[in-house]
């Protein structure tokens, strides 16, 4: 196989319900490998009904403009039976280049008011970043990452023994 090894470090903080995730990719093989995407965090099994996504829109003279969206407003209508709910729809929020807050802040908030629960995330990077939410059967999946090949033409050649760290 490729000889690529991924190690995930999770840092917890006393008294605060926060965790920091960092992934390290090491080429333990004998040939160069090209990395085009590395997830920083993935959360699946997010309850489908009753969620709201808060997206922080940003601009040069209008910063921190949080907007609340229902998933129906974002194009996730319930059109299929419960056992096969999958719209193939993806909501993507991202930035390319070295101005990390050009259109959006590198964060988001998923709220479920009925259960008084929520999940907030922040991508710690001063360059390109990406997050997406998709539906899979009867739940949502959140993927958070730094730069990737599709949005920002990111690629990293890992020579044997080299390591790359996610944002």
Please give the residue ranges for each predicted region.
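Polysaccharide-binding surfaces and accessory modules of carbohydrate-active proteins
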Residues: 1-136, 152
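Short Pro-Gly-centered flexible turn/kink motifs
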Residues: 156-167
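Short, structured beta-strand/loop micro-motifs enriched in basic residues and often containing a Trp
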Residues: 140-152
């Amino acid at each position: 196989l490729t000889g690529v090894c991924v190690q995930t470090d999770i840092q917890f903080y006393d008294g605060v319900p926060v965790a920091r995730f960092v992934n390290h990719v090491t080429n333990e093989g004998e040939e160069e490998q090209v990395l085009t995407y590395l997830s920083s965090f993935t959360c699946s099994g997010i309850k489908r009904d009753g969620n709201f996504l808060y997206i922080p829109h940003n601009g040069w003279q209008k910063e921190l403009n949080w907007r609340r969206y229902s998933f129906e407003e974002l194009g996730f209508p319930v059109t299929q039976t419960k056992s096969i709910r999958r719209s193939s729809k993806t909501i993507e929020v991202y930035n390319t280049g070295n101005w990390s807050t050009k259109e959006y802040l590198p964060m988001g908030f998923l709220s479920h008011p009925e259960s008084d629960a929520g999940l907030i995330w922040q991508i710690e990077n001063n360059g390109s970043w990406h997050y997406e939410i998709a539906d899979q059967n009867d739940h949502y999946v959140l993927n958070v990452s730094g730069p990737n090949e599709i949005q920002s033409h990111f690629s990293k050649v890992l020579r044997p023994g080299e390591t790359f760290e996610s944002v």
